[in-house]
Amino acid sequence: QSFGNQWARGHFM
C-alpha cells in the first residue's frame, strides 16, 4: 500500500 495513493484519492477525487 502506498500512502501517496491515499493522499491522491482525497486530492484528485
Swiss-Prot record:
Top-rank taxon, per record: Eukaryota
Family indicated by similarity: Belongs to the bombesin/neuromedin-B/ranatensin family.
GO cellular component terms given for this protein: extracellular region
Function of the molecule: Possesses insulin-releasing activity.
One matching Pfam family: Bombesin
GO biological process: defense response; neuropeptide signaling pathway; regulation of insulin secretion
Organism in which the protein naturally occurs: Bombina variegata (Yellow-bellied toad)
Modification type Methionine amide: residues: M13
Example GO molecular function: hormone activity
Lineage of origin: Eukaryota, Metazoa, Chordata, Craniata, Vertebrata
Localization terms from the record: Secreted
Modified residues (Pyrrolidone carboxylic acid): Q1
This protein's UniProt keywords: Amidation, Amphibian defense peptide, Pyrrolidone carboxylic acid, Secreted
Organs and tissues of expression: Expressed by the skin glands.
Protein name (Swiss-Prot/TrEMBL): Bombesin-like peptide 2
